[in-house]
Amino acid sequence: MRYRLTVPARINLLGNPGDANEGDFATLSAALEVRAGALVEPAEGLTLEMIRRDDSGLPPLRLEFRPGAHPLPYDGQLDLLKGAVNRLYQHSAEFRDKFTRRGARLATWTDVPRQSGLGGSSLFVLLALAGLRAFYDLDSGAHNDYVLAELAQRVEAVELGITCGFADRYVPLFGGVAYLDYRDKLQQRDLGTEPFVTYERLDNWVADLPLVVVSSGVARDSGDVHARMRPRYLQEHEAWQVRGGEPPPMARFMAGAWQTAWRGKIALLAGDWPAVGALMNENHRLVNEMMTYCGFADGAGWANNLFIETALANGALGAKLTGAGGGGSAFALVHPGDEGRIVAAWQRVAAEAGLTKAHIFRPGIARRGLVVEVE
C-alpha cells in the first residue's frame, strides 16, 4: 500500500514565543491551509526524497540507504527526515523490528515558503514520523499524535541541535484554531517526564479569521533567533528564582506575551476583533523590544516591521510576526472585506523596498491537521 499525507503550516496569533522557548506559557495559534506533503510506499531499502515544487531551480534530492540502516548520518542533506527516522528508531521497539524487515520510500514536498516563519521545517519531521507510523502500522496508542509532536521537538532540539519550542510540532498535527498551554515544559525534559501540551480547539466558535500573510523573502533561521534569546531567558529566570525580587527583563517581556494569549482567547471567543488586534500589536511591541534587548539591531527585523507598520497605516486592526523574527513572515488582522487594501499596500512597499521574493496571500484556516490517505 501507498500512503499520501499532508500537514498545514501554522501561525502564532498571540503569545509567542512562550511555547517553551522563552518561557512555558501559552499561545493562541492557528493552522493555515498551506501544506506540505509526503508519499510513503514500499522500497528495497530506505529511500528519502525531496521533490521540488517551487521555482528555485534546485534539483530534486534523493538518498538511498541499505535496509535497516541506523543511525543515518547528518551531513546537511535531508537531515530533518534522517532525524525523524533516527529518533523513532531510538524511541520505538516496534519500529526497530519492522524497519529491519521492510523497506520504504519517503518522498516529501512543500508549498510553504522556505524560512518563512510558518513552521515549515517541522512539517518534514512530522510527515516522516506520521508517514512511518502509517506505513509500518505502528501501534496508534503508543505512537499517538501527542507522542509524534513531542518526538518531532526532540528531533530538532536533540538530534539536530536546533533551539525550538512546541507550537510548530503540535499545530500542524491537530489543526484548527487553538489555545496551547505549555506549563512545566520550559526545561524540555525527556519524553514522559513532563506534561504534553494542552491543545484546546476553539474553531467551533470561530468561523474564520480575516487574515492576510506576507512572507518577506528575507532568509532567516528561527533556531538562530531562539539560540540567542532562550539562553538569555533561562539565565535570567534561574537567577531570579534564586534571588527573588523584581522579575528580570526577559521574564517581564514573556509574562506580557502570555497575557496577550489568554486575553486574546477571551476576545476571540467573543468575536471582538478590535481587541484581538490590539493584543496582537502589544505582543509585537514586546517581541520587538525583547529582540532589541537580546542584541538584534533591527528588533523583529526591518522587513517584518515595514510590513507591520504598513498594515496598521492602512487600517489593519493588528499586525505582528507569525513566529520568530529576523526574516520570516508577518500577518495582519483586518476588517472583513479589507483584505485587498492590505494586499495592495504590501505589494507597493515590497516593490519600493526591493523585496522581490515577498509572497502575499490570504490563508484559510486548516480545520484538519494531519491528513492520511491510503491508496
Feature annotation, model-predicted:
Residues M1-L14, G18-D19, L32, A36-R96, ...:
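C-terminal nucleotide
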Residues E22-G23, A30:
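Phosphoinositide-binding peripheral membrane targeting modules
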Residues F25-A26, A38:
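Catalytic-core region of right-hand nucleic acid polymerases
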Residues L106-W109, Y146-Q153:
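Short, conserved phosphate-binding/catalytic loop or strand-edge motifs used
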Residues T110-S116, L317:
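Short pre-catalytic strand/loop immediately N-terminal to key active-site residues, enriched for Gly-Thr
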Residues G117-D139:
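DPxDG-like acidic metal-binding loop motif
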Residues A324-G325:
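Long, low-complexity C-terminal extensions of enzymes
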